[in-house]
């Protein structure tokens, strides 16, 4: 995995389908709220168990830094409404004297959803936002040590980090993308300030992550040019991507960027304007806009690639034979010379047949061997 991530050629094409959430939770046999609410087991442990079950090359992205922040934070559960299908958990919180509320819906057999988000108004809540994006002052490595030990040699150990932009902020604001778009044009000075605050926090986080020496760092930016236009992404997101990847390059730690949805333009920027090592998931149309062979031809000398079997048409609704054909096609398109990790075009659905994942692994371990 690390050789491929660094755009080198290993003994075979690594295989790491994206199943970081729903499939590991399903394999526990428990209601999903046991995993997401009670952390029994924690999701990261369920993922490692899934890697063992399927025999994939582990792509661990949940390294928990337990950052310390210079702020006072209190949280209490105000109300829980339970049915056999869902638990709706409402929390009251105080961050440095600034109160807010949030609500999370935990489902029996689906990933949770934030049904009330903490920040309601950009201008009214600007003090809360400034406290939200304070840089950390330290971290606690205790869970990192436990996670590394549990993963062992099953895969590569990664820590994720976000960066400024609508793709991150929409999960914080009750009005979501609609409000962010209006504020971008009507209150641009506050959006610009939030970008600077978020970048300052991310750079401090990255310095500590690099001190912890993971195998790689994942820049987590799902929808970077899908949830905002490329022009907005260049203003809000790209400068921080450049700084984060440069820091990691200087430290000798490879970086990968995950951004589902459209990604062709983002791949161009990353190849030509950043120090990024690897990009994923390079989704095909209509969800994305990438052709694996074209991306390999245009940017394969600078970027390792990870992707990109269709998560619904092939992995969820297809047969093992369909998976085998698509996997061979992906290896043919991007496997030459290394620098390729066989994966899916984003998260596999909960009901993806186990047989299809087993077939993907089989193809990588047979057809994906370099001679």
Which role does the model predict for each range below?
Residues 1-39, 110-371:
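Active-site loop segments of alpha/beta catalytic cores
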Residues 16-24, 51, 55-68:
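Ligand-binding clamshell of periplasmic/extracellular solute-binding protein-like
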Residues 31, 42, 57, 85, ...:
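Short, low-complexity intrinsically disordered segments
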Residues 43-62, 208, 212:
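Catalytic domains of carbohydrate-active enzymes, especially glycoside hydrolases
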Residues 61, 80-81, 284:
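Short polar/acidic secondary-structure junctions
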Residues 61-75, 163-166:
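Short, glycine/charge-rich beta-strand/loop segments that flank catalytic centers
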Residues 68-128, 154:
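A contiguous, low-structure linker/loop signature
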